């Protein structure tokens, strides 16, 4: 079992943790998130970006992690970036908590996300269905108010 965590924060009120767990390279990865400080009753883009570099804030994390060179899509879509985790949904207080299981996100092997950055976006991810070029790259999810580098944990 490999475990990893990202402590998410930035130049906003958005903060929280994202925990990753994977049993083996062929097993799916469980992703558990607990994020606060978002707008209430909102959907916010949630992605793994390529770099673990946050020297200039979350913009230094680069584009979505996309080792297969595909277009952007929903977490459950057949064609998507590895880093496309869709949207998190907030409650009336702006908190988002949940767990998803993902077959593309890996902690083990050459496409590991360890050392990369999780980003919570300021807008809703259109899941690649926005009808423009940017939608196929970013889902038009907007600015990056909070992020955290994924690191190995106990």
Swiss-Prot record:
EC id: 1.15.1.1
Biased composition (Basic and acidic residues): 125-136
Compartment(s): Cytoplasm
Keyword Chloroplast: no
Cellular component terms (Gene Ontology): cytosol; mitochondrial intermembrane space; nucleus; superoxide dismutase complex
Needed co-factor(s): Cu cation; Zn(2+)
Region entry Disordered, spans: 125-144
CDD domains according to UniProt: Cu-Zn_Superoxide_Dismutase (cd00305)
GO molecular function terms listed in the Swiss-Prot or TrEMBL record: copper ion binding; oxidoreductase activity, acting on a sulfur group of donors, oxygen as acceptor; superoxide dismutase activity
Annotated Cu cation binding sites: 47, 49, 64, 121
Disulfide cysteine pairs (residue numbers): 58-147
Described function: Destroys radicals which are normally produced within the cells and which are toxic to biological systems.
Stated family: Belongs to the Cu-Zn superoxide dismutase family.
Protein name, UniProt field: Superoxide dismutase [Cu-Zn]
Organism of derivation: Neurospora crassa (strain ATCC 24698 / 74-OR23-1A / CBS 708.71 / DSM 1257 / FGSC 987)
Gene transcribed to yield this protein: sod-1
């Amino acid at each position: 079992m490999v475990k990893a965590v990202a402590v998410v924060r930035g130049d906003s009120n958005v903060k929280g943790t994202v925990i990753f767990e994977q049993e083996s390279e062929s097993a799916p990865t469980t992703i558990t998130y607990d994020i606060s400080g978002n707008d209430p009753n909102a959907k916010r883009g949630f992605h793994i970006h390529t770099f673990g570099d946050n020297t200039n804030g979350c913009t230094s994390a680069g584009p979505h992690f996309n080792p297969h060179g595909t277009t952007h899509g929903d977490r459950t879509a057949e064609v998507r970036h590895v880093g496309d985790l869709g949207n998190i949904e907030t409650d009336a207080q702006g908190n988002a908590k949940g767990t998803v299981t993902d077959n593309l996100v890996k902690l083990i092997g050459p496409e590991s996300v360890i050392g990369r950055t999780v980003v919570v976006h300021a807008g809703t991810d259109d899941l690649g269905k926005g009808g423009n070029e940017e939608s196929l790259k970013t889902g038009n999810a907007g600015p990056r108010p909070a992020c955290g580098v994924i690191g190995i944990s106990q």
